């Protein structure tokens, strides 16, 4: 005789990381505060966009594993027109974030870039920084 061996095999789906990233124009203008005669106060000055979604970055995870998405803003090295420019990111509830956990549910997750700085010394039209997005499993 021979020996009979019974084995158990598990077949698993391969892990698929598939992420779509879309973004608005990411064009910003610095707006000086203006006098509001109704409130007798100046409106807030700062960086604004033309359209509501211009500062947005949307990530959709169409894979089958959850991912972490890291957001980073780096000020352009040759930017001399603006002092102390900093970029940060907020989620859809305006909560600050550096990393967003995105489940594999094919639902879009929106993040927005917020800019803060001193008032620019003059008007200019050029790249003010770089956004880096890192996808991690």
Regions of interest found by a model, annotated:
Residues 1-13, 57-58, 63-66, 101-137:
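C-terminal, structured domain-capping segment
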Residues 1-56, 62-65, 137:
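Long, low-complexity ectodomains and other extracytoplasmic segments of secretory-pathway proteins
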Residues 4, 8-11, 17-21, 71, ...:
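Generic preference for hydrophobic/aromatic residues in regular secondary structure cores
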Residues 66-105:
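Surface-exposed binding patches on compact interaction domains or structured appendages
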């Amino acid at each position: 005789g021979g020996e009979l061996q019974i084995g158990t095999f598990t077949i698993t789906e391969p892990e698929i990381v598939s992420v779509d990233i879309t973004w608005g124009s990411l064009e910003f203008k610095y707006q000086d505060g203006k006098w509001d005669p109704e409130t007798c106060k100046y409106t807030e000055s700062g960086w604004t966009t033309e359209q509501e979604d211009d500062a947005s970055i949307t990530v959709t995870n169409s894979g089958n594993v959850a991912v972490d998405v890291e957001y980073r803003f780096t000020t352009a090295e040759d930017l001399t027109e603006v002092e102390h420019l900093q970029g940060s990111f907020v989620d859809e509830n305006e909560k600050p974030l550096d990393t967003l956990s995105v489940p594999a549910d094919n639902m879009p997750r929106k993040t927005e870039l917020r800019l803060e700085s001193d008032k620019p010394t003059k008007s200019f039209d050029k790249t003010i920084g770089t956004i880096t997005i890192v996808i991690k499993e």
